[in-house]
Regions:
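Bacterial N-terminal signal peptides
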Residues: 10-27
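Electrostatic cytochrome c docking/interface patches
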Residues: 25-36, 110
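Sequence/structural segment immediately N-terminal to covalent heme-attachment motifs in c-type
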Residues: 31-47
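Extracytoplasmic electron-transfer domains, predominantly the class I c-type cytochrome c fold
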Residues: 43, 51-99, 338, 578
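Blade/loop signatures of beta-propeller domains
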Residues: 108-152, 301, 306
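Repeat-blade elements of multi-bladed beta-propeller folds
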Residues: 119-127, 160-184, 200-223, 246-277, ...
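Surface-exposed loop and turn segments in beta-propeller and other repeat-based domains
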Residues: 155-157, 238-241, 296-320, 368-397, ...
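Beta-propeller blade signature
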Residues: 227, 281-293, 354-367, 480-491, ...
Length: 603
């Protein structure tokens, strides 16, 4: 998706915790830690790098243990595998801070979990149809009470510089993943800790719960099931055999099956290593038995197995077709028993008809039913914007990923619509009952590598869709951003609210861009921003009725140093009269490590 490293879009820019500093390797010599960093890592971790890797100042905010974990089992194993254990530890201690701060004993919950208000849950990324709409009864917030929101508690994530996990609220608890792979079960009202679990790699998705279990994936392509009450592992499996497969979209759970989207970081390595044989990864959706983790079916978004297509200029084999990652949570059409997924670009030639598309699979068998492509011949990877373009496909196109989830809604009278949006700034209304026939299309945003629509919109029960605009422009922090409201039936623009002038001007990583996902309740839409603000908009007019700046230090309930930063891939979660948001997105944005919980008057 051409996203920050693994995210789904502009890999290099938007993925905090997704950056993959895979620099060219040189023969191992007896080098000091500083020399090791300069020869192995500085190529990617420098100002203006093409992959959005964090700069040394950001790395120094991480614990050395977190850096070591990234080198040994996480997102930097590509470079870590070329180092000896002693070298990995030396680089980690050279870059990182002292030991991660432990969670205070006083932050442990003293009582067993209590059930939340009936129906006051937000389970996973969104409902089956990906509307990201919370009805009034479950929201517990209104147009009148939203302006009264105040911070109730803050929770700090230890040793990390990104907090990109979107919280799930279920039975009075918060389930959220962290960049270091820790999954937390917290009390929704107080933030105290019930349990933690250490996954193999970072967890950037929203966990989904069902049948007493919590399900999630990590940035090494692993999928997990834990006992929701205790955090004990029930099963763990690989969603894909490719070593560069990652899970960046939340799974969907229905009728005993877990549907998992699979994306990959092939395109990032292609940018940093011309000797890499680009590219062999294929996106997919995998159906697993939720009870056992056994694979039921696997549906690839590239139907043909990649084959050798030649050599690049340094003699490395080239492969294709490839790519077409599924970056986001799939949409379940429970009426038609169909699963819809948005796809990204081809990483190498030849291009396919399933890239930059909505693809539809049969929920029972995984059979491809149809594909509706919006941008054809879009072969692209990060080498196309890097210093060394060896692995850039011939005649690359525009990187117009459809990296967010389609929104399925009824229009009445037996008619339905599936709304899709992409990085080119286009929004489409499709007929899901006529193989994705285009009902309408609108050019809303300027688009670009980090432009257009990145992480997804929302739709309420009034026939309106709300989408946040990115249009990030490097070096121009006041450019980009905005929230737009469209009529579902026609695509007519009802209103647009431009992004306010950023208050973070002068801070590295500041931008007015608003690539974050939207959440909507009756009368109010919530949207975060690259500038670190979380805002509430009146849905009738687009007027901003509440605004909170997260770029500040917080007193955390678990005693850790906590600070907010950019809000990019993380979505607001509303349930039981509270609003939850994580803040911090390192790389080219502003780092942070905090989960914030708001309630009316802070009560």
């Amino acid at each position: 998706m051409g996203t920050t490293l693994w995210s789904r879009f502009p890999f290099w820019l938007l993925a905090p915790g997704f950056w993959l500093p895979l620099c060219l390797c040189v023969p191992a010599l007896a080098q000091s830690p500083e020399e090791l960093f300069q020869t192995r890592c500085a190529q990617c971790h420098n100002s203006g790098n093409a992959v959005g890797a964090p700069l040394p100042d950001t790395l120094r905010q991480m614990s050395w243990q977190a850096i070591l974990t990234a080198l040994e089992t996480g997102k930097m194993t590509g470079i870590g595998d070329t180092l000896s254990p002693a070298q990995r530890e030396a680089i980690s201690k050279f870059l990182g801070t002292a030991a991660s701060q432990p969670t205070l004993p006083s932050s442990k919950c003293s009582a067993v979990p209590q059930r939340g208000k009936d129906g006051a849950d937000w389970n996973g990324w969104a409902d089956a149809a990906n509307t990201r709409f919370q009805p009034a009864r479950s929201a517990g917030l209104t147009r009148v009470t939203t302006p009264k929101l105040k911070l109730k508690w803050a929770f700090g994530f230890s040793g990390v510089t990104s907090a990109f996990g979107t919280p799930t609220i279920f039975d009075g608890r918060v389930f959220v993943g962290a960049a270091d792979g820790t999954v937390y079960s917290l009390d929704a009202r107080t933030g105290c800790v019930y349990w933690t679990y250490a996954a193999v790699a970072g967890v950037r998705i929203s966990p989904v719960l069902g049948n007493g279990s919590v399900y999630f994936g990590d940035l090494r392509g692993n999928v997990y099931a834990l006992d929701a009450a205790t955090g004990k592992q029930i099963w763990r499996t690989r969603a894909d055999e490719h070593p560069l497969a990652v899970i960046t979209g939340s799974p969907k759970l229905d009728s005993g099956r877990l549907y998992v989207p699979v994306s990959g970081r092939d395109e990032s390595i292609a940018a940093t290593n011309p000797a890499y044989e680009c590219c062999t990864f294929r996106g997919s959706v995998v159906a697993l038995d939720a009870a056992t983790g056994t694979r039921v079916w696997k549906a690839y978004t590239v139907l043909d197995v990649p084959k050798a297509t030649g050599q690049n200029k340094v003699g490395a084999k080239t492969w294709g077709p490839s790519g077409v990652a599924v970056w986001s949570s799939p949409t379940l059409d429970l009426q038609a028993k169909v699963i819809y997924a948005g796809t990204g670009v081809n990483y190498s030639n030849p291009p396919t008809e399933t890239s930059d598309a909505i693809v539809a699979f049969d929920m029972d068998s995984g059979r491809l039913l149809w594909s509706r492509q919006f941008t054809n011949s879009d072969s692209y990877n990060f080498a196309c914007v890097g210093q060394d373009k060896t692995n850039c496909p011939k005649d690359p196109f525009i990187d117009a990923d459809l990296g967010n989830s389609g929104i399925l809604r009824s229009l009445g009278g037996g008619k339905r619509i599936l709304v899709a949006s992409d990085k080119s700034g286009m929004v489409y209304g499709l007929d899901p009952d006529r193989e994705g026939a285009i009902l309408w299309k609108q050019k809303i945003a300027s688009g670009g590598l980090n432009g257009g629509f990145m992480w997804g919109g929302a739709s309420d029960d009034q026939g309106i869709a709300y989408l946040g605009i990115s249009d990030f422009t490097a070096g121009k922090p006041e450019v980009g951003g905005g929230l737009v409201a469209l009529q579902l039936a026609t695509g007519k623009k009802l209103w647009t609210t431009p992004a306010p002038k950023p208050t973070c001007l002068g801070i590295a990583g500041c931008s007015a861009a608003q690539p974050a996902p939207v959440t909507v309740i009756p009368g109010v839409a919530f949207l975060g921003s690259w500038d670190g603000h979380i805002r509430a908009y009146e849905t009738k007019t687009g007027t901003i009725i509440w605004d909170f700046d997260t770029v500040q230090d917080f007193q955390s309930v678990n005693g850790l140093k906590a600070h907010g930063g950019s809000i990019n891939s993380m979505a607001p979660t509303v349930a039981g009269g509270m609003l939850y948001i994580t803040s911090g997105y390192s790389g080219t944005a502003m780092p942070g490590n905090v989960l914030l919980a708001f309630s009316v008057d802070g009560k």
